[in-house]
């Protein structure tokens, strides 16, 4: 892999390739002038997977991995739930520590709980929190194959007549199985001005600290990138909407750009 220095930052780029293994849908707002009820997201007329969708899927994979492999032995490695406490559902609140209940998540958003000496969770360290950037910049993935958006029709069955309900025909857009999306992800390895190095505690944080990196557990930078970024991104099994209807299966590969 080739590292590039940009404005006192050492950055490594990776090509992210997503291949659809099932019909695939990333939703956009409905155009009031169109008959399509659930359009596919496009940018400049090209179907895309937004960076926010990919980042959310990576975060979910990281959370699951941390909970299954580290959280019980090292509470500092428990992920947060990335939302303010007031926005958490009762079920989500049951996942955080309370009195004698340990919880699998450490609490609500790290950014919301900011303050001098507050510990930042691994997912926010990598992907950012409110008021603090992370080390990974997720790309938009653009359709890079000959496939095109196709229209899919859906309906609802009338339980009384056992026929299609009147007015229930709906049109959505999807990409077929086998389509390929590509984009370029950037990983910050070193920031000379801030004195940040990926995989090490950051030194300038008055409002946060990287407690999970200050204990006995240590990773080399290449091992850190592989375990917490590349392997987790390639472990994403599904993405997008309509998953319960057979959509969203994907295969992601990441290679040095």
Residue map of PLM features:
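RNA-binding basic/glycine-rich loop and surface signature characteristic of RAMP-family CRISPR effectors
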Residues: 1-157, 162-257
